[in-house]
Amino acid sequence: MNSKTLVSDLRTQRVLPIFRQNSAEVKQILNQLRPFNIRVIELTTSIPRWQDLVEDLSHDYIVGVGTIKSESQIQQAKAAGAQFLVSFGFFDALIEEVDIPVIPGAMTANELLTIQRAGVRCAKIYPASVLGKKYISDLKVLMPEMELMVTGGIPSSKDEIDSWIASGAFCVGVGSSVTSLLQAASRRH
């Protein structure tokens, strides 16, 4: 998988479920999401034995590992079969990763510029709910070529997701509101 394919898949999916629950809960929620064609998911390094879960789910899903904070986590994620990496920030080993796509985190235009100058064209804006939709629109004016995924405190209602995408985000990451995502998805079908 390359970055363009990942962005395309996430743009189509519109929402990236971010899991922090234990393995059994993650699998239960994924079973509930199956009818809604969720293909791309993020598992965070805070899940106990996350490497085993990545290995297990990477046969059925495009699995990213999130909350990456170190070079050793990058190596562990790749060894487990992760197809992309996500972080709430950025550091040299992450933005220099070439084997699989990365979505480093940023909060300011300067951080986005640093990420872009390193050759990365996709970033996670966190915490987006604090910064707001107008902020995303303003960032897109400055750097229209950057693909921005928003996460952090965003409700997963259809209207909320639509408005973040209209502001310039290509995808909305939902973590604690993943159960609301299920409810919103069930209302659409």
Indicate where each model-derived feature is located.
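Conserved N-terminal beta1-alpha1 strand-loop-helix module at the mouth
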Residues: 1-84, 100, 154-158, 166-167, ...
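Conserved anion-binding
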Residues: 49, 69-74, 78-176
